[in-house]
Amino acid sequence: LAGSHLRSAYELKQNLIGIGLLWKYGYYDQERNQDQTLNVAWNEKQYSFLEDTGIKFQITIHEHPVWVKAFYLNPETFKSAPLFLLTTDLPENDYVSQTITHRLYDANVATKVAQFILLGVGGAKLVDLLNFNPDRYHLNEAHGLSAAFYLYQKFNRQLPEVTKRLVFTTHTPEEAGNEKHDIYLCHKMSYFCGLTIDEVKKLYQNDSDQFNHSLAALRFARLANGVSRLHGEVSRAMWSKYENICPILSITNAQNWRYWADKQLYRFMEAGDNFGIDDRKKYLKKRAFEIVADQTGKLFNPEVFTIVWARRFAGYKRAALLTRDEKRFEKLLSLNDGLIN
């Protein structure tokens, strides 16, 4: 989604840059053993298309200086807005600091908080080193919220100066899915950029010892959004019990179809050619089932309606949601409008 966002920003000529982390291994690759059982493999990624900016700087993580290096994805490489990626996998760092950018979704809580600091504080500091003066800092989820504490210190502890520059996108429709960490751990990890725990609790108006990243983002930002009309409604209801949060709008997520979608299928759609759409879909479906058969040995009938879960299969993504209301689901399947095949 983030990559698609940057492609669209490039096409629209929007004045925007992206900042992320450069993963050495990323999320694990699922491979199959000879007996078809799954194997988890951590393969080192290759980034020959990135440019070394020569920018190196230090941030504080766990009360310790950590070196950060910035790499750059040129807009012309993939026709995307400028993207900077940060890594700590450097010989100047100790091994623990190097591993901060090794694995996405690291199970170690301290490593995860360190990643949040790198993204937020490291990203905001990079913007300063580039001599940019952005009108807006956009947080995609609350993973980079530590940037708000960096900006708070930068603007002489004037929260309104942070708020007028900060916007926030929330994706998670369940409060339990929003990140919370022990506030004492966050403080020990240097997440709060020198603020005391009492100062943090007062600043984001919460006395809990569990630091709620999303709640802090909603109180620090001038504006937030959910990722669809319904999700916006769910988010407003979910956070309504909290006072002094910013307005939550609805902005529907979308993908840059020019990159990922089948071009011929869209040509038929634009031409209103229902026969062409149906024929092309059947061809693509058959090709997909051939890949599944090759990898798993399972055969699927292209003439049977098939639901495909094209996402990481994690419980909080709620794969069973589609059939939660079985009567409504059956009604959708029985509609004779040619949309389901």
Segments the model singles out, each with a brief description of its role:
Residues L1-N341:
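Catalytic cores of carbohydrate-active enzymes across secretory and cytosolic contexts
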